[in-house]
């Protein structure tokens, strides 16, 4: 059930909305829109006042509805007696200790000071830091809580179960809540583990464990969401989409697999890996706390002085929060109800990059859970209806499939309004064509060069061994352990290669010795993601992609011989050889793309714009007088902006040169459209007759081919245009997905030259920038430490605050309010840094110097300047220039000589009359 308030509704295409209010979700694809259109913080309609009010208790009542408290978040009905509940203040339960609790942490008590839990005027980060101290008993107030003694596993591993708020417990359907076969605390307690070890040491032998393994459950599907600093809307978009996809899998009725070995939901684990406390958006933590997978105040900075590396939370929940900040909870046993989902939340204490997050996923959690399939998602990627099911089915039906990916397409907004941005439209077209032409081709060969980390899947046993070993060489946290094989011992080429580490994993998987794993593309599985909307972000993103893919592509070609050690059959090896030749050829074309684009532009303009005997002394489009002049200007502008790209790339960050890059995109776009018009003119002339396209169609096929492929090159241009325009249209209609040809193709044609002239130039000019290391500082000082107590011969224990359930619920009420507050994007400051301003001045100075000198050289030596009114020939202009230059140098030398002579004479005279 979705709870609605007064916010605006914003449904979009291919989303999850059925537009219903306070109704169960239907099981059709239309149910995949975020189910709510209004904010939860407005007044609620009776009889269900709050998001956690239990509708089961209301059904069948004929009397007047039960009176609720005035709060829209009343948890009164959630304080139901529970056999597992105990009062920490009652006798024989625990003893009081010196731990104090900030009185501001208590809620609903008149006269209490404002709490950081409800403080809206304080930044979310600062309020979060205060909550850690307050909730953990580190405040300066007088409130005292009872404590309990927690034994460390094997004397060193801190793993504690914390009661979840009553509202979360009671949101679980009774059939799951009352079933104690799996685990008595699975739905009543959240498990927290402070991992003070490297991911490779997170093993059962060292005392670490995970709930699914503790409950002896087989994990078929491990769904991982990697996160850096995305806001709560982006995170909820991904997490809610995953929850709905799991519902699709659980609702399968005829699947032989899911009817074996217990309920389907027990075979699926969702793992969120956050890359550092400091960059993490603290509002996102409120969303996770609302569904039960996180609590404030339980994390420990260190255990007996040993620093915590990762904070791991585990809980099984039936709650979800939509991107519109609407809370979804089960209401009945219908197909629209979300099933229980086993969740793990790994919050790394320090930012150590995405590849390290994957090491936690595969080497730490994967080895304990031993899943069959791992699905990788980036926070912000929204899986489409049944997308995860289609990915899993691909592995289920192909025992040799080692990895797969779905179709990623750009998020276009409501009514496709983002297509008005040419950059977004161009990227949309690029993604679509890649999914129509490139991915199917590579899938046919059996080796997809890259499975995007934002939306891909791997068979866990396929990547175990050498593939993961090679993959994790790029983890800088292993640099000391690996030595020369690690990131610190790599040359600049290998470091760039690990900017596209997913390509390395794909190659190593296919080339795995003694195995015959192949990769595939699953067209039915779709994911939606945001794309950069501004030039600086776009350029920075593509720098990493282009440099990483180029280096990884060369690596795979140079190490192709390792394929002979694999277990592929002769047919597969034949196709892999074809793909190798195709990749060599593509790399060759990519290397010379800069010159190719300039020559193509120049040749097409000369063909249609230069009057000659071969074209009847005509010129398109401005006539035989103006067209050559304009074409010459266009060429000079093209070369000038191309030179500018090198100046910008070698000295500036894209964010520090926004206007320059914007002007470059516009200039190259206008030139590209001008060339496209010229090329279309060639095609028209080819089929209407007329020089230079007057093909011989009267003397047989031989004469026609001879004229078609003649020295003018017009026939080749027609073939290239047909291969570009025609192939894109035909393939798009074959895949029944042609809309991008009408909405995005024109924008792509305008931006296409910028892909070469701007993106490639910037990428290669910044080959040295591999962006390794942590981003920013890592602040964990807000977290309390855990210290053991106990004398000699006694087991090491830690005293942990044992809060009463009423206080847990009161604090949770404020957490829900924060989580469901409508998201307001922060304003981005456009101010340049001091370093950027210095670099911008340097760029303007160098640009002025180079272009003024270049303009002088062109004016003196160019033969075509007579078109601009210069009456002299280039030879005569050169002669006069040298005369002026020689006279100028002579005058300067004469002045210097006069000055030197005067100084010498003056010095001699003064020497004679100087006083001794």
UniProtKB/Swiss-Prot annotation:
InterPro entries cross-referenced by the UniProt entry: Chitin_synth (IPR004835), Chitin_synth_fun (IPR004834), Chitin_synth_N (IPR013616), Nucleotide-diphossugar_trans (IPR029044)
Any matching Pfam family: Chitin_synth_1N
GO CC list: cell periphery; cell septum; hyphal tip; membrane; plasma membrane; porous cell septum
Biased composition (Polar residues): 59-75
Keyword Transmembrane in record: yes
pH effect on activity, per entry: Optimum pH is 7.5.
Biased composition (Basic and acidic residues): 14-26
PANTHER family referenced in this protein's UniProt entry, alphabetically: CHITIN SYNTHASE, CHITIN SYNTHASE B
Protein name in UniProt: Chitin synthase B
Organism this protein belongs to: Emericella nidulans (strain FGSC A4 / ATCC 38163 / CBS 112.46 / NRRL 194 / M139)
